[in-house]
Amino acid sequence: MLSRSARCSRAVLFSAKRSLASQANTGANASANQVMVSKHVQDIDPEMYDILTKERKRQKHSITLIPSENFTSKSVMDLLGSEMQNKYSEGYPGERYYGGNQFIDMAESLCQKRALELYNLDPQLWGVNVQPLSGAPANLYAYSAVMETNDRLMGLDLPHGGHLSHGYQLPSGTKISYISKYFQTMPYHVDSQTGIIDYDFLSKTSKLFRPKVIVAGASAYSRVLDYKRFKEIADACGAYLMSDMAHISGLVAAGVTRSPFEYSDIVTTTTHKSLRGPRGAMIFYRKGVRKVTKKGKEVLYDLDKRINFSVFPGHQGGPHNHTISALAVALKQAATPEFKEYQAAVVENARIFGEELVKKGFELVSGGTDTHLILINLSNLGIDGARLETLLENINIAANKNTIPGDKSALFPSGLRVGTPAMTTRGFGPQEFAQVAAYIDRAVKLAIGIKSQESPDAKDARSKLASFKELCKESDQVKQLADEVYQWVGEFPVPGEL
């Protein structure tokens, strides 16, 4: 008779052989299609994998200054590439049009719960929809919930720091944003001298225009918003106050800037900027009593059903469950002490970055920043935002040209927009942003010199810019500076490297 240990050894060996045989049979029986869908991208599509590799390298070795960009966490990326994307789930938790959604319901409900908790919102007084695919559609869904076609909307003018999704049309009447086709839109402005929103102008024009919605929000405005004043203005003309905190939602979550929730009826946000989540959006909306009439009658909000219906089935079909699940992870991270420290650093880095730019002779729109964002006025430097953006890209610095008050062209504006969230994520502090300011200063000097060499055959603005781009690629000074930046920034890890 075999000993107990021998019997155990034989059992283990038999089990291992059976497992290997099973795997062999599975492999032998697998169809070509099953084999294909089990391969990694580097095996199935080397061409696309090569592009991915190049983009990873670009991000690693570039200074990312675009304020709306960030580096999301490895754990968020885990969910974005997960099985959560396989499931169709039209509808809402507990009310789906497809079966098999019990875990999808859990994920979406958890995401909603964390969103309300992050901003200290009472679920009896606030609700949130986490299904919008991105920020501009989220704004459209919110407008459509409370307005009919041709109702009136006011938002910050695009050249003054607003966003296309708040409505934009040219002085000639040409409607650039389709929001201005669906609704009647009128902009409000910043004061031309201070660069600060002209609340008195908004108050006067809103009483004449009588909008249904006033949007408090911006994409290129570096100062805190006076939500209390916005609410007073909205109440005076009977409008909903909708705050778009897409750029600052991470700062709001960490308590390092003013929150819109105290005074707003609706709050929208993207989730991938300062919040550092996946590319998505959320719509928060009030519940309960909206106002009390002179006769003492309570008028209740009815935003819950209207906004949820506007999202689905009004505009969207199946939500992106991998994004919602990834957002839930990002919201958990945003509630941590580490995230609060990060956001405090974002604001402090922006302040110091702005001061360093001023020391080098740059003028900042509004004189500085209270947030994560800086808008540089280039109008007195002999270079435009389009050319400076081009040269910066050639030296591995990503920033973006931007209109400033008084600009006539969005293609050749006088501003450059920069911000601190992405590089703060990678470990930049005051010393590093001082170095970035020095790089921008060197870039401006190079750009001015290269501009003077543009081809005399280039007659129109686009041809001149094309000539400038070619000269940038050929410049030895540009190549030397590009290599310097490449080596320096590559020393700072991207998420997932530690």
Swiss-Prot record:
Its cofactor is pyridoxal 5'-phosphate. GO terms for molecular function: glycine hydroxymethyltransferase activity; pyridoxal phosphate binding. Gene3D superfamilies: Aspartate Aminotransferase, domain 1, Type I PLP-dependent aspartate aminotransferase-like (Major domain). GO terms for cellular component: mitochondrion. InterPro entries: PyrdxlP-dep_Trfase, PyrdxlP-dep_Trfase_major, PyrdxlP-dep_Trfase_small, Ser_HO-MeTrfase, Ser_HO-MeTrfase-like, Ser_HO-MeTrfase_PLP_BS, SHMT-like_dom. Its EC number is 2.1.2.1. One of its GO terms (biological process) is tetrahydrofolate interconversion. Pfam families: SHMT. Pathway: One-carbon metabolism; tetrahydrofolate interconversion. It is found in: Mitochondrion. Keywords: Mitochondrion, One-carbon metabolism, Pyridoxal phosphate, Transferase, Transit peptide. It comes from the Eukaryota. It catalyses: (6R)-5,10-methylene-5,6,7,8-tetrahydrofolate + glycine + H2O = (6S)-5,6,7,8-tetrahydrofolate + L-serine. The modification N6-(pyridoxal phosphate)lysine is found at K273. Disulfide bonds: none annotated. Belongs to the SHMT family. Homotetramer. In eukaryotes there are two forms of the enzymes: a cytosolic one and a mitochondrial one. Interconversion of serine and glycine. PANTHER family: SERINE HYDROXYMETHYLTRANSFERASE (PTHR11680), SERINE HYDROXYMETHYLTRANSFERASE, MITOCHONDRIAL (PTHR11680:SF57). This is Serine hydroxymethyltransferase, mitochondrial. It comes from Kluyveromyces lactis (strain ATCC 8585 / CBS 2359 / DSM 70799 / NBRC 1267 / NRRL Y-1140 / WM37).
